[in-house]
Swiss-Prot record:
Keywords: Cytoplasm, Isomerase, Porphyrin biosynthesis, Pyridoxal phosphate. Disulfide bonds: none annotated. The modification N6-(pyridoxal phosphate)lysine is found at residue 266. This is Glutamate-1-semialdehyde 2,1-aminomutase. It is found in: Cytoplasm. Pathway: Porphyrin-containing compound metabolism; protoporphyrin-IX biosynthesis; 5-aminolevulinate from L-glutamyl-tRNA(Glu): step 2/2. One of its GO terms (biological process) is protoporphyrinogen IX biosynthetic process. The gene is hemL. One of its GO terms (molecular function) is transaminase activity.
Length: 427
């Protein structure tokens, strides 16, 4: 009998390209039929066939409290009855701006938007407007949203400018983006030595979550900050994924680096569409209506999204919240590694706060090339075995995973036991 998931997927493909509204959801990387989810409670999600899973995707990061947290739901319900959107200032957007600037010391001012892509796109435009320069440096394997200038792959040689990695991106747009190797401070220094007076900004995921999880070296982050300062370039931390996920002060607080601009999404909206970018006052005052850099949005600062975001940001400030989140995420990683080792499976894992990476390799990778060398087919088999057992991981070997405050010790233990059984079956 055809499953409800399969029926929905077949129907979806009639009017939605690929049957999904974001490519990774189609399961093209791992194969099979995607899950259509209809309900989430705590650490669990239920698909259209009624099957429940322990969820390690968490809507790709926002659900740090788990699904349908009662305080967040109550805040949204209370806001909805007062109106869905005004296209005008509201008190809630002032409240969340105050709170964001309090929690992120590098931000003197902040502008709300509706997505992480909007946040990074706007921050880059602002950096170019502030410096009067055009060139942007990004790093291979880092994802900053789907705006044209960021859908770029590396050129053919060291310090070359980029080429489009998506159809529809003009070559001229990509040519103002330089793609370098993540965690290579010398290559970054060489780029500044050659092009320093043209570089408007460096944008980076301080912890990479879009080529699985890659931790930065402190030397790399320090070099980035020093080189931007010396050359008058803007350092942009893309904290859309890491913001309030790796710690209350985000990645910049964890690693002790002060960026000039920061972008946020995911956790700040508590599951609703909300993003933000902010930073130094002298840069932020270049944005319209104060300055010449234009940025706008009909739904920016939406009162329902800000209600969810405020409720979430208040709850994550509870004493011990991040210590507990980090401990349970580490317990998951350590347990999976121990299970794999027991059965002779090449496997490694690591976490930073509530983010984690799983790799079918002897050691955790530190670069994009090392990620590509991991055994993707082994991951795909693991993914489907765990899905069958009721444990939902990201449907791609190149995506980080997430643990929420709602995950219990029993949830973690159950996932480790399922992995142990799968690894044992490989003998």
């Amino acid at each position: 009998m055809t499953s409800r998931n399969q029926q929905l997927f077949e129907r979806a493909q009639r009017h939605i390209p690929g049957g999904v509204n974001s490519p990774v959801r189609a399961f093209r990387s791992v194969g099979g039929t995607p899950c259509f989810f209809q309900k989430g409670v705590g650490a669990k999600v239920q698909d259209a066939d009624g099957k429940w899973y322990t969820d390690y995707v968490g809507s790709w990061g926002p659900m740090i409290l788990g699904h349908a947290h009662p305080d967040v739901i109550a805040a949204v319900q209370a806001a909805v009855v007062d109106g869905l959107s005004f296209g005008a200032p509201t008190e809630k957007e002032v409240d969340i701006a105050d709170l964001l600037c309090e929690l992120v010391p590098s931000m003197d001012m902040v502008r709300l938007v509706s997505s992480g892509t909007e946040a990074t796109m706007s921050a880059i435009r602002l950096a170019r407007g502030h410096t009067g320069r055009d060139v942007l440096i990004k790093f291979e394997g880092c994802y900053h949203g789907h705006s044209d200038g960021l859908l770029v792959k590396a050129g053919s040689g060291l310090l070359t400018f980029g080429n489009p990695s998506s159809s529809g991106v003009p070559a001229g747009t990509a040519e103002t983006t330089m793609v370098l190797t993540y965690n290579d401070p010398q290559e970054l220094a060489d780029a500044f030595a050659k092009h320093g007076d043209k570089i408007a900004a460096v944008i980076v995921e301080p912890v990479v979550g879009n080529m699985n999880l890659i931790a930065p070296t402190q030397a790399f982050l320090n070099a980035m900050r020093d080189l931007c300062t010396k050359n008058g370039s803007v350092l942009i931390f893309d904290e859309v994924m890491t913001g309030f996920r790796v710690g209350l002060k985000s990645a910049q607080g964890l690693f002790g680096i002060t960026p000039d601009l920061s972008t946020f999404g995911k956790v700040v909206g508590g599951g609703m569409p909300l993003g933000a970018f902010g930073g130094k006052r002298e840069i932020m005052e270049k944005i319209a209506p104060l300055g010449p850099v234009y940025q706008a949005g009909t739904l920016s600062g939406n009162p329902i999204a800000t209600a969810a975001g405020l409720a979430t940001l208040k709850l994550i400030q509870a004493p011990g919240f991040y210590e507990a989140l980090t401990a349970k995420t580490k317990a998951l990683c350590d347990g999976l590694v121990a299970a794999a080792k027991k059965h002779g499976v090449a496997f490694s894992a690591q976490n930073i706060g509530g983010m984690f990476g799983l790799y079918f390799a002897e050691q955790c990778p530190g670069t994009y090339d090392e990620v590509l060398a991991c055994d993707k087919e082994a991951f795909n088999r693991f993914f489907h075995a765990m899905l069958d057992a009721g444990h939902y991981f990201a449907p791609s070997a190149f995506e980080a995973g997430f643990v929420s405050a709602a995950h219990s010790d029993a949830d973690i233990a159950g996932t480790i036991a399922a992995a142990d059984a799968y690894f044992a079956s490989l003998k």
